[in-house]
Design a protein with these regions (language model features):
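Hydrophobic membrane-targeting and insertion signals
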Residues: 1-59, 71-76, 231-233
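Short secondary-structure junctions
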Residues: 37-44, 149-154, 203-208
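N-terminal beta-strand/beta-hairpin edge segment
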Residues: 40-141
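Solvent-exposed coil/turn segments that connect beta secondary-structure elements
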Residues: 52, 70-72, 87-89, 139, ...
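Extracytoplasmic/luminal low-complexity segments enriched in Pro/Gly and acidic/polar residues
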Residues: 189-233
Length: 233
């Protein structure tokens, strides 16, 4: 009888150890499958799933899912690198409570089939209404302005200079023009006299709404709200 009890105890310990060690691996693979079925692609991908205690993962709950990807793309968004942590994750229903992360080298699709770039995008907050902070550097702004001026049938600016708190100065055909940035209908625009230039408009496939804009000496910061749950359904 004592021998049988010993065998049972050892079997139970082995099962617990297997669940402790194996649960994160099983959960990681499940997250990878969920990402692929949502349309997410990446040239490199690392996923770490954690729960305390780890066997909770076998019940479909994860405290955190940490995703690091290079060359990432999903729907109307591409990024050179992505580093996201999802919290309070239900693996079965593929839902999560909040997100905190960063995109570097982001390219965002627009309705006309073009893209605009943001050197860095920070995302933090609840799943369906996370705050997105887009940081636009000089290269991002030049590309936006050249495209917008071209669409308006005007000569592309040769230089751009931030003028805090809300303006950009551009040099066009040797002349200096100053435009005021604003958000109009979810798009980033610049008003130069009577001319309204549309600089950035997230496309319909990307659940991102631009809401605020500010100009600093180092560039432009655009604030918005993104539905990450809709981005990674």
């Amino acid at each position: 009888m004592r021998g049988c009890l010993t065998v049972l105890v050892l079997a139970l310990l082995a099962a617990l150890l297997g669940a402790w060690v194996g649960a994160p691996i099983v959960a990681r693979d499940a997250v990878a499958v969920a990402l692929r079925t949502s349309g997410f692609t990446a040239k490199s991908l690392s996923i770490r799933v954690s729960a305390n205690p780890p066997p909770l993962l076998l019940l479909g709950h994860a405290d955190r899912v940490h995703i690091v990807a290079g060359g990432a793309a999903v729907r109307g968004l591409q990024a050179d690198s992505l580093d996201f942590t999802l919290s309070d994750v239900d693996l079965a229903s593929r839902t999560f409570g909040s997100v905190d992360g960063t995109l570097v080298g982001a390219r965002i699709a627009q309705p006309a089939g073009t893209t605009f770039s943001a050197g860095k995008v920070d995302v933090a907050g609840p799943t369906d209404a996370a705050l997105a902070t887009l940081q636009l550097d000089a290269a991002d702004l030049r590309a936006m302005l050249q495209s917008a001026y071209g669409d308006a049938g005007r000569t592309a600016p040769a230089a751009v200079e931030p003028v805090p708190p809300s303006e950009l100065a551009v040099t066009v055909a040797g002349k200096r023009e100053v435009g005021r940035l604003a958000i109009d209908g979810g798009s980033l625009v610049m008003r130069v006299g009577d001319l309204v230039l549309r600089l950035a408009s997230p496309g319909p496939d990307l659940p991102l709404e631009l809401r605020t804009v500010s100009v600093g000496s180092g560039g432009v910061v655009v604030g918005g709200v993104v539905d990450v749950a809709a981005l990674l359904p």
